[in-house]
């Protein structure tokens, strides 16, 4: 099975189209992760600035009874982590700011999706978009190509005649494609850790 896995990778590296798309998705992943990190850092900073401003407003408020102070209200921000650089989840749709005031139950407001163009509501260009839609599609086409090439060249029959079971052959091929996805995921993780090393510490 290890030999099949090794030969599968050798066959993939002989394919110029595979090398081109692997490099293309690798570069695209680096760009998406890098810009996701920049955007996340800006969002964290803007939340800190807003929190500081709200606290300053609260401290500078004139003397009043507690009930009036409760009606003045304040804002709560949903905390942002470094993983938001890869995937925001529902934050861009639901929002990250909640107004707190007495006698009222407000919903989370100021979502980016409500203030953006219709086309951008389908999702931002982030690493999660590549991992959820584009890279799996690439792996499906790649797996179909390897399967059809094995049948057309007669290599599949040759491998079975040599004593390899069909289950082992299929498993080795699946494992080789999953290892490619794991390499791309590792690349995104390394970029994320490298640019957020101080924040992780």
Sequence positions of predicted segments:
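Aromatic- and glycine-rich beta-strand/loop motifs that create alpha-glucan
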Residues: 1-25
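Helix-loop-helix units of permease transmembrane domains in multi-pass membrane transporters
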Residues: 3, 144-179
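N-terminal low-complexity, Ser/Thr- and acidic-residue-enriched intrinsically disordered segments
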Residues: 24-26, 31, 45, 49
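Secretory targeting signals
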Residues: 29-36, 58-59, 96-138, 172-201
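Membrane-interface elements of multi-pass transporters and channels
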Residues: 38-42, 46, 150, 194-199
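Membrane-proximal extracellular/periplasmic loop immediately following the first transmembrane helix
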Residues: 40-106
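Hydrophobic alpha-helical transmembrane segments
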Residues: 66-82, 116-129, 155-164, 189-193
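Long, hydrophobic alpha-helical segments
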Residues: 75-89, 123-149, 153
